[in-house]
């Protein structure tokens, strides 16, 4: 294994082990046998010191209104960068839904300085990847490159961001690809279920405008539409740049000043995303001949900025484990029942299951919600869930791209990037009473959608008085 790569792997492994040791310490209390350290057994760092150490790796600055977050990871062989665009679904409407996704996808095909063939040749030679993605709250133009080829990759990346070609041929190619992808959504039960769920959960909300668009809205868009939309979005007040890798912050500032920092500042001010409100339980059934019923139910959840997000994460993890135990392990009603918590500005959590016996499966899942609401969980259960959560979380943060995405998410919709690294103490502070409180507050008025056999669904089971 390359020595630098080995150091990077050992670094992330040490972070995980440190957090798990700290979790074990907090779970067990400060017993005398642990507290009395020997000279050869130094005390484990506190959560506060870990947070401070991680925060010190991040440098933030502004260039002409463009906020930049630079996280240095010494020894890393790769660099990840993302130019994030604020707004998401709030930027579009029912008539132009999908324009931002199409604009970013078409931009990566060619730019003024790097026509299609030249761009593909250079990116292939360096192993560099330029891509894009979008969600309800923001979109991103992304870069993944080796440290060796970062400077040249940055030139291409910024040319794509600033001077995309939007040729008729490129736009038509990407347009067709996106339309074909959307056209078969109803053929995939899981994808179709999510589409049905969005229509029910997001009625009257900006999220109803899908950033993916529809075949109809995408087909109406022309290159001139993309150029006008690009000009509108490329203002530093709308953008956030995040870079993670073994780079010098002053050098990064110089690169930004000579490229993205020359964009107009603009006057964009992000609007507060309205929170969702479900006033009652409901079930919407779409008939489809399938081997099993596909079922999902959503309830409102706290956003990342709310103190309730910490006990809600623990409650959702407990619910997931209990649902799996009751539905899959004990009764084998479904292969992969699930409880989940998303990370949106207007947030939701929910239940998911595929089952022939829809009523029994949902009844069991709702019973587990009632159990969380009425029976205090043990402190041991909470600490076990937190330890499991931390393991999964930090393993998921091994790559520079994942860390860049996490910093951006918290900066854009989570109250600031520092909240992405100081949640340990807040998770550890969750109490059994907190679990009961958030379960009662949020896990109610569930909006169910069912794709399958209507005759197998007792709507009374789905709309039972959970949490009421």
What are these model-derived regions, one by one?
Residues 7, 20, 37-40, 45, ...:
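Acidic/histidine-enriched segments that form metal/cofactor-coordinating
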Residues 36-50, 240-245, 352, 383-468:
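C-terminal regions of mature proteins
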Residues 1-12:
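N-terminal secretory signal peptides that target proteins for export/translocation
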Residues 37-46, 203-207, 211, 236, ...:
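An aromatic/glycine/proline-enriched structural segment found at the starts
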Residues 82-147, 210, 318-333, 340:
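M16/MPP (pitrilysin/insulinase) zinc-metallopeptidase core fold and M16-derived inactive scaffolds
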Residues 109-113, 144-175, 341-396, 463-468:
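M16/insulysin-pitrilysin zinc metalloprotease superfamily fold
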Residues 177-196, 274-293, 329-333, 344, ...:
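Short acidic/His-enriched helical or mixed secondary-structure segments at domain edges of catalytic enzymes
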Residues 16-29:
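Bacterial N-terminal signal peptides
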